[in-house]
Amino acid sequence: MLLELDEPLLQRIYQLEPDPRPEALFADTELGTHVEQGPWLIQLTPDSPLLSAYRQAPEQWPGVLLSSGRPVDELLAHLRAMLVVQFEGERKGILRYYDPQVASYLFAATEAVITWLGPIEQLFWHGPTWADRSENISHWRSLRSESTNHGAPPKGRLILDRMQIAALEQQQLEAFAYERWQEHSHAEFNQILGYMQQGIASGFDDEKSLGAYLEARLTYPQHLSHPQIASGQVQFRLQQLQSWLEATPAPSESQG
C-alpha cells in the first residue's frame, strides 16, 4: 500500500499490521528534503487486518494499493522514477499519482500501461472524480498490467503524453469547480464547470480572474453564454462582461 501518513494514521497501521516496514517514497530522490510530506510504502500480507480495514473504509486511507511479486527494492525504484515526470518538452513536475483523486484521472488516460506500471501487476484505488464527488458517487478502480516481463526501471524521466496532460488539467479544473460549487449550493456542479470552461476560453485563465468571472456569471445564471469580450486589461474586460450581464434581458424576457 502506498499512502500519505500522519501520526494518528501511522499508529493505526502498527495496531493492524505488526511489521509494516514503512519506506519513505521521497527518500533517495531529488525530493529527499521533503520526506515527511511524501507517501510511504507499507508492506501487507494477504490476510492483513490493515488490508481488511482499507477495503471496508477506503476513504480513511489516502492512498493506492499495489500488487507485485517483485522485490521491494525493485518496486521502490520504479515508484520513485514516477515521482518527477517530464511534459511539453523540457518541463517537469511532481506527479502525485498515489493520490486516489489524481489516479482516477491519470490512469484512466494512460495507454502505455506496461511502461507506467513496471513491476506492478495491478493497481487498485477507491476514488471519485470531482464530478463524481459532487453526486456522492464513488467506486473501486483498478489498472492491470498484461506483461510478465517488467524489465528495469526507466532510465530517463517518464513523459506525460497529451491525453495524460489533458486529464490532469481537467482534474485541476474540476477541483477548482468543486471548491466553488461548495460555496454556491444553489448552482449545479456542471453549471459551474461550464462557466469556468467559457471563462478560460474567454481569456480568464488565472485563478483570480477566473474566480471573478465565475462570480459574475453566477450572479446572472439566466445567461447561458455571452458575446466575445473586447481585448484589454483583465479588470476592463470583467467590467465589460458585468455591464452586458446587467443590461441584457434574460432570453425568456427578450422573446416575450
Region spans (language model):
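Short, hydrophobic/proline-enriched secondary-structure or compact coil segments at domain edges
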Residues: M1-P8, G63, L214
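A contiguous, surface-oriented mixed alpha/beta subdomain in the mid-to-C-terminal portion of proteins
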Residues: R12-D28, E36-I42, P46-P49, V72-D73, ...
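Signature for HUH/AEP ssDNA processing cores
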Residues: I42-L50, Y54-G69
